[in-house]
């Protein structure tokens, strides 16, 4: 959401230019998605999420400091490529969860995600009025917190081996 705002507000992209960017993004993302899935299967969820969160942190800092429209467009495209690696969360969950718990846990996760999807944009929208850079630096911080959590994932997760530190009996 905020990357699009940046392109419009700071770099004065038109509706046609944003629409073209959406099309280009789809033309890149759709054929790349199966390859990302294969990459996750090859390197594992932990490594995939580590790559994703490092990439997103760098991208968000890039959004915060860029003065180049071309760089902002490249960051936007990379943002979506890295974000597509989030499917690793779903495969990780499938490996550690009891199959009987997946539906109810997915429902709770979906609900929490949607609450955050309403709350965070409103909060960040108010912050945006003060400084768009702060919004992107905050996004980078969230990515770094997610990175810390990904680093706590085992390389070979399964039921009973969900995290490296902080296991509860």
Walk through the language-model features, giving the residues of each.
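Hydrophobic core of transmembrane alpha-helices in multi-pass small-molecule transporters
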Residues: 70-84
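Loop-to-transmembrane helix entry/capping segments in MFS-fold secondary transporters
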Residues: 15-16, 99-109
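Short amphipathic helix-loop junctions that connect adjacent transmembrane helices
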Residues: 1-18
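Intracellular juxtamembrane helix-capping segments at the cytosolic ends
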Residues: 84-97
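Multi-pass alpha-helical transporter architecture, strongest
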Residues: 137-169
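Transmembrane alpha-helix termini and helix-breaking/packing motifs in multi-pass membrane transporters
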Residues: 5, 119-135
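Structural signature of the two symmetry-related core transmembrane helices
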Residues: 47-62, 140
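Helix-to-loop junctions at the C-terminal end of transmembrane segments
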Residues: 31-44, 128
């Amino acid at each position: 959401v905020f990357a699009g705002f940046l392109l419009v507000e700071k770099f004065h992209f038109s509706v046609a230019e944003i629409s073209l960017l959406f099309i280009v993004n789809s033309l890149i993302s759709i054929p790349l998605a199966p390859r990302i899935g294969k990459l996750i299967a090859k390197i594992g969820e932990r490594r995939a999420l580590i790559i994703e969160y490092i990439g997103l942190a760098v991208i968000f800092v890039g959004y915060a400091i860029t003065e180049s429209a071309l760089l902002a467009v490249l960051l936007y495209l990379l943002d979506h490529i890295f974000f597509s690696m989030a499917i690793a969360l779903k495969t990780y969950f499938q490996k550690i969860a009891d199959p009987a718990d997946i539906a109810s846990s997915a429902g709770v996760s979906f609900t929490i995600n949607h609450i955050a999807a309403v709350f965070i944009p409103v909060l960040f929208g108010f912050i945006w009025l003060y400084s768009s850079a702060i919004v992107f630096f905050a996004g980078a911080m969230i990515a770094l917190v997610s990175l810390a959590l990904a680093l706590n994932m085992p390389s070979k997760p399964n039921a009973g081996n969900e995290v490296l530190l902080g296991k509860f009996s």
